[in-house]
Design a protein with these regions (language model features):
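Substrate-positioning beta->alpha
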Residues: 174-178, 192-215, 223-227, 236-241
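Conserved beta-loop-beta element that borders a ligand/cofactor-binding pocket
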Residues: 150-171
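NAD(P)H-binding glycine-rich loop region in Rossmannoid oxidoreductase-like domains
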Residues: 50-95, 125-134
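N-terminal Rossmann NAD(P)H-binding glycine-rich loop of SDR-like oxidoreductase domains
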Residues: 3-23
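Mid/C-terminal beta-alpha module of Rossmann-like enzyme folds, strongest
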Residues: 216-286, 320, 324-325
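Conserved Rossmann-fold NAD(P)-dependent oxidoreductase catalytic core, especially the SDR/UDP-sugar
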Residues: 94-141, 161
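Amphipathic terminal alpha-helices
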Residues: 302-310, 314-336
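Conserved C-terminal active-site "lid" loop/helix of NAD(P)H-dependent oxidoreductases
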Residues: 203, 225, 270-314
Length: 336
C-alpha cells in the first residue's frame, strides 16, 4: 500500500510513519523545507519536500505519484496570531484536498470512484463546541480552524474519514511535557476550583485508529467522524498523581510535590502574558489566550462507542501505563 503522510515530522505523524513502515507500507512523507527530520531517519521513508502554502508547488510534487490513501496529520496547535490557525489548519487542508481531487480526476478517477485515494484527516475534539448537546464553553481559534477543515473534507469527492482525538500524550509530545517539568520542580499546579473531567488517548492508540481508518471496509468507515479516547474519564489530579508516582519510581524514593490550586483568573493572567510575549517575540508559546479556553473548560468527556463499533477501535493503553512510558521516555531522552 502506498501512503501519502503529511505532518510526519510532528508528534503523532512520526509515530504513524513508524507504524506504517512496520506494516510494510510504502510511505511518502510530505514535509516543508524547514521541517525537522529528527524522527524521520528511517531509510525506507520517502521524503517529499514541498511548499504547503503554494498549491501549484504541491501539485507539481505529487503529480507523478498515485496513492492508495492520504493521511493528513499536518497542522498547528499553537500560533502567534489566531488567524494563523486558519492558514495552517484550514487553508492547508483546502489546498491538499483540491490538489488530490484534481490529480485523481486527471487520471480518470471520476469514471472509477474506487481509484480515488482514501483521505484520513486528523482533527481534534476541540473542533466541536458541544458534547451530547452540552455546551463546552467558549470556542477556540484552533478548534474553529479544525472544524472548518472538517467541513472542507466532508464536502470533497474523496472517500474520507475524520478522526477526533481528545488530549493525545506520549513520547515526543511537548505540551504535556510542561506539566511533567513543573512536577519535576515539585509543584502540582491546577487552575479552577470546580471539578474538571478530562480524557486522554495515548499516541499509539491514535496511530491504531489511523491504520484502521486506512484499512477498514469503505462501508464501515468512510463518511464517518470518529472520536478517540482511552474510554475513561479522569481529573487533572489523576494525571499529575500518576506523573508524580512515576517520578518517584525513577528516583527510588517518594517525589514530594506541593499542590497549588489557583483561581481561573490567575491562569487567564498567565495566558495573557503569553499572548504579549508572542506579539513581542514572534514566537508561539503553549500558554496563550486561545489555550486558556481549552484549559478552563471543565468537561471533556466523550463517547467512543461508534469508534469501537464501526472502526474497530480498541484503545490498549490506559493512563497509568501511558504515563509510565511517557515519563521514562522523557528521562531517557534528556527532556526532563
Amino acid at each position: 500500500m502506498r501512503i501519502l503522510l503529511t505532518g510526519g515530522s510532528g508528534f503523532i505523524g512520526s509515530h504513524a510513519a513508524e507504524a506504517m513502515l512496520g506494516r510494510g507500507w510504502e510511505v511518502w512523507c510530505a514535509v516543508r523545507r524547514t521541517s525537522s527530520r529528527r524522527f524521520l531517519g528511517d531509510s525506507r521513508l520517502h521524503l517529499l519536500e514541498t511548499d504547503f502554502e503554494d498549491e501549484a508547488a504541491m501539485e507539481a510534487a505529487l503529480q507523478s505519484l498515485r496513492f492508495d490513501a492520504v493521511v493528513h496529520a499536518a497542522g498547528a496547535t499553537k500560533c502567534v496570531r489566531k488567524s494563523d490557525f486558519h492558514r495552517h489548519n484550514t487553508l492547508l487542508t483546502a489546498r491538499l484536498v483540491s490538489v488530490l481531487q484534481r490529480l485523481a480526476l486527471r487520471d480518470g478517477a471520476s469514471e472509477c470512484e474506487s481509484r480515488l485515494p482514501r483521505f484520513v484527516f486528523l482533527s481534534s475534539l476541540s473542533a466541536i463546541n458541544s458534547i451530547e448537546g452540552e455546551a463546552l464553553g467558549k470556542p477556540t481559534a484552533y478548534g474553529a480552524s479544525k472544524r472548518e477543515a472538517e467541513k472542507i473534507v466532508e464536502a470533497c469527492r474523496l472517500p474520507w474519514v475524520i478522526l477526533r482525538p481528545t488530549g493525545v500524550y506520549g513520547p515526543r509530545e511537548r505540551d504535556y511535557l510542561m506539566m511533567v517539568q513543573t512536577l519535576c520542580r515539585h509543584i502540582d499546579f491546577a487552575a479552577g476550583f470546580s471539578p474538571q473531567h478530562i480524557t486522554f488517548v495515548y499516541v499509539t492508540d491514535v496511530v491504531q485508529a489511523i491504520m484502521r481508518a486506512v484499512e477498514g471496509k469503505a462501508e464501515d468507515v468512510t463518511g464517518h467522524i470518529f472520536t478517540l479516547s482511552d474510554g475513561e474519564t479522569y481529573t487533572s489530579r489523576d494525571f499529575s498523581r500518576l506523573i508524580a508516582g512515576e517520578l518517584s519510581a525513577l528516583k527510588g524514593s517518594r517525589h514530594r510535590v506541593l499542590r497549588v490550586t489557583a483561581p481561573l483568573f490567575v491562569l487567564r493572567a498567565v495566558c495573557r502574558c503569553g499572548d504579549i510575549f508572542m506579539r513581542v517575540t514572534g514566537k508561539a508559546v503553549t500558554l496563550n489566550n486561545d489555550k486558556y479556553n481549552i484549559l478552563s473548560q471543565r468537561d471533556w468527556r466523550c463517547d467512543i462507542s461508534a469508534s469501537r463499533r464501526l472502526l474497530g477501535f480498541r484503545p490498549e493503553v490506559k493512563l497509568a501505563e501511558g504515563v509510565r512510558r511517557t515519563v521514562r521516555w522523557y528521562r531517557q531522552n534528556g527532556w526532563i
